From Swiss-Prot:
Its main location: cytoplasm. This is 2,3,4,5-tetrahydropyridine-2,6-dicarboxylate N-succinyltransferase. Keywords: Acyltransferase, Amino-acid biosynthesis, Cytoplasm, Diaminopimelate biosynthesis, Lysine biosynthesis, Repeat, Transferase. It is an enzyme of class 2 (transferase). SUPFAM superfamilies: Trimeric LpxA-like enzymes. Its EC number is 2.3.1.117. GO terms for cellular component: cytoplasm. InterPro entries: DapD_Trfase_Hexpep_rpt_fam, Hexapep, Hexapep_transf_CS, THP_succinylTrfase_dom1, THP_succinylTrfase_N_sf, Trimer_LpxA-like_sf.
Length: 274
């Protein structure tokens, strides 16, 4: 694996010179191998090690290099044709392969090659970009988008129209992460490497980036870039110091543990916020 990483790192330093016409065999094979490993879930761009999320930047570099070494090609669709550098994940799947993988894909859901989809996942008409990781038992609902290299945990529900941001550029940015057992409400956006920790519930229409204030009304604490585990979050506003205006924020209205979450429905958690 170290040899593979070294090839990617070296090639990335001269990426501006690489084209589909001049890409050498060693680089091309290394990049294709990484994309295949990401596609199968054997590698992932970010993983939790000793309780902390670690981003493997070299894997993101491999994804970026794939755009340098591959030319656009015609991609066949059910009702149309497309023209892109990245093939679709399910292009060569037959019924036996779908049965083996154990997930459902509802047309016209689109998943790019290099994204991993785990067993018991349901993809409604949605989009999953290259480098993303979608873990077991997750629902990606209609018109939801999972951005490049985003990490989605087990038993997550991404409601209709949800946007989970991708972070191939800038390269040093960490991927957006939704941990296990989270619910993200319809039309919400989580971007810029924000981490939504385990068991959190995000109401519909909540927008969270790195600069968004995440206000805990019980403690008065303000978080940036991280929704603490077990948070129930709605959209809100905080007043300016002079009281002349207010600015958007996300508000943690309560905290719930797994036991409470198991007994009480998501809608009930969001309705009883006073």
């Amino acid at each position: 694996m170290q040899q593979l990483q070294n090839i990617i790192e070296t090639a990335f330093e001269r990426r501006a010179e690489i084209t589909p016409a001049n890409a050498d065999t060693v680089t091309r094979e290394a990049v294709n191998q990484v994309i295949s490993l990401l596609d199968s879930g054997a590698l992932r761009v970010a993983e939790k090690i000793d309780g902390q999320w670690v981003t493997h930047q070299w894997l993101k570099k491999a994804v970026l290099l794939s755009f340098r070494i591959n030319d656009n090609q015609v991609i066949e669709g059910a009702e149309s044709r497309y023209f892109d550098k990245v093939p679709m994940k399910f292009a060569d799947y037959d019924e036996a392969r779908f049965q083996k993988e154990g997930f459902r894909v509802v047309p016209p859901a689109a998943v790019r090659q290099g994204a991993f989809i785990a067993r018991n996942t349901v993809l409604m008409p949605s989009y999953v970009n290259i480098g993303a990781y979608v873990d077991e038992g997750t629902m990606v609902d209609t018109w939801a988008t999972v951005g490049s290299c985003a990490q989605i945990g087990k038993n997550v529900h991404l409601s209709g129209g949800v946007g989970i941001g991708g972070v191939l550029e800038p390269l040093q940015a960490n991927p957006t992460i939704i941990e296990d057992n989270c619910f993200i409400g319809a039309r919400s956006e989580v971007v810029e490497g924000v981490i939504v920790e385990e068991g959190s519930v995000i109401s519909m229409g909540v927008y969270i980036g790195q600069s968004t204030r995440i206000y805990d009304r019980e403690t008065g604490e303000i978080h940036y870039g991280r929704v603490p585990a077990g948070s129930v979050v709605v959209s809100g506003n905080l007043p300016s110091k002079d009281g002349k205006y207010s600015l958007y924020c996300a508000v943690i209205v309560k905290k719930v543990d797994a036991k409470t979450r198991g007994k009480v429905g998501i809608n009930e958690l969001l309705r009883t916020i006073d």
